[in-house]
């Protein structure tokens, strides 16, 4: 739909003489009443005597109206219309209406109003109602086929007329014999009487057959009633095996309930087992990772202790000789304990491979017996360093930590 189509349609309808004013806003929304009036008026312009019902109240009437208009325009004006767009009765229907109005408008422009009136008068001379003539057309076709068949049979009979004429002439010319005529009449009467007797016998047989059928029907009814009563009796009587059947059914139901319960328990336990295996696998992986971390930290701590031990030995050589034994002991003894405390604080709650008890016990003894002998303290300190080096590297027992020689020299100084 476009503004140009709406404008052309309104101008063409005004030029064709449509009595009602059509605004361009009328067809922007669905307006089936206006579209039906325009279609009926355009059809009247083509064929004033056409008979199309104008009822558009119900949906069925509107569909029939649109189909009739489309059929008329296709047969009369050879214009193919889109019934779906016409039924929408909005801007899309304007394009379909323009197909009709453009033909009328062009005819009016070429020949003028007078020429168009003359053409309409000429067309009215040969008007016909297609809807009312369809039945006549079917009847004419049937009569034409009958005429053909009857004409063929009549032609055959006329071909036999020569022989039949001679036979007819001989029969008419031959005199009638009373005795022979009576004989023929009697034979015919006997045949008729025989047929009548046969018909009476058939009627009697029909009556007897009817009686027999009624008797059979009555007998069947009695049997049906007797069987129905027997069925009711059987239904009212409880079978002897019904108690056992019900008991067996209850037992089966109990067994089925037990089976369901056990099956559910089995399924639950299998699920728990799978969960347990999964958790064990996770724990194993976690322990493995933890062990790797501990080993790495122990290696780092071992390296750090070696570096710190070498640094401490160099510091002892630089110190002056007038330092007291107590000050030297306070610098040297807490260093291994500090390294072990750092290691224990790094992995709280985890199991350490190896033993750390030797160093701790020796430190305690050194703290208690620090006033007895300085040389014993130095020897205990050497033992502590060896024990700590062994405990820090449990995975590599063949690797030994070499004690730095400056420590012995520093001890000898004292």
UniProtKB/Swiss-Prot annotation:
Residues 198-291 form a coiled coil. Keywords: Cell projection, Cilium, Cilium biogenesis/degradation, Coiled coil, Nucleus, Phosphoprotein. It is found in: Cell projection, Cilium; Nucleus. Residues 305-414 are annotated as: Disordered. The modification Phosphoserine is found at residues 314, 324, 326, 410. InterPro entries: Clusterin-associated_protein-1. Residues 312-328, 360-389 have a biased composition (Acidic residues). Its main location: other. Pfam families: Cluap1. GO terms for biological process: cilium assembly. It comes from the Eukaryota. GO terms for cellular component: cilium; intraciliary transport particle B; microtubule organizing center; nucleus. Interacts with CLU/clusterin. Interacts with UBXN10; the interaction is direct. Belongs to the CLUAP1 family. Required for cilia biogenesis. Appears to function within the multiple intraflagellar transport complex B (IFT-B). Key regulator of hedgehog signaling. This is Clusterin-associated protein 1.
């Amino acid at each position: 739909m476009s503004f140009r189509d709406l404008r052309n349609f309104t101008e063409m309808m005004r030029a064709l003489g449509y009595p009602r004013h059509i605004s361009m806003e009328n067809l922007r929304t669905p307006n089936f009443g206006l579209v039906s009036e325009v279609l009926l008026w355009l059809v009247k312009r083509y064929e004033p005597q056409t008979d199309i019902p104008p009822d558009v109240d119900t949906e069925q009437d509107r569909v029939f109206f649109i189909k009739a208009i489309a059929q008329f325009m296709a047969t009369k004006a050879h214009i193919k219309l889109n019934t779906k767009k016409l039924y929408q009765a909005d801007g899309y229907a304007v394009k379909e209406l323009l197909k009709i109005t453009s033909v009328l408008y062009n005819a009016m422009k070429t020949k003028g109003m007078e020429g168009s009136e003359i053409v309409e008068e000429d067309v009215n001379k040969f008007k016909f109602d297609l809807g009312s003539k369809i039945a006549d057309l079917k009847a004419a076709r049937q009569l034409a086929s009958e005429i053909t068949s009857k004409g063929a049979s009549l032609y055959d009979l006329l071909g036999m007329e020569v022989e039949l004429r001679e036979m007819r002439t001989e029969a008419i010319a031959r005199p009638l014999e009373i005795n022979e005529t009576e004989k023929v009449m009697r034979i015919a009467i006997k045949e008729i009487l025989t047929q009548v007797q046969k018909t009476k016998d058939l009627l009697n047989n029909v009556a007897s057959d009817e009686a027999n059928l009624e008797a059979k029907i009555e007998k069947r009814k009695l049997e049906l009633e007797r069987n129905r009563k027997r069925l009711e009796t059987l239904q009212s009587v409880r079978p002897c095996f019904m108690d056992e059947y019900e008991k067996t059914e209850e037992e089966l139901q109990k067994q089925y309930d037990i089976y369901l319960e056990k099956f559910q328990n089995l399924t639950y336990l299998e699920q728990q087992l799978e969960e347990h295996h999964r958790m064990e696998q996770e724990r194993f992986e976690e322990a493995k990772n933890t062990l790797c971390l501990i080993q790495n930290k122990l290696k780092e701590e071992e390296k750090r202790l070696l570096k710190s031990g070498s640094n401490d030995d160099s510091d002892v050589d630089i110190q002056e000789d007038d330092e007291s034994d107590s000050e030297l002991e306070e610098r040297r003894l807490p260093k291994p304990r500090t390294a072990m405390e750092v290691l224990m604080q790094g992995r709280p709650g985890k199991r350490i491979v190896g033993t750390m008890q030797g160093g701790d016990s020796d430190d305690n003894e050194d703290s208690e017996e620090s006033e007895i002998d300085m040389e014993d303290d130095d020897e205990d300190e050497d033992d502590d360093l060896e024990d700590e080096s062994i405990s820090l590297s449990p995975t590599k027992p063949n690797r030994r930590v070499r004690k730095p020689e400056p420590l012995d020299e520093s001890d000898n100084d004292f």
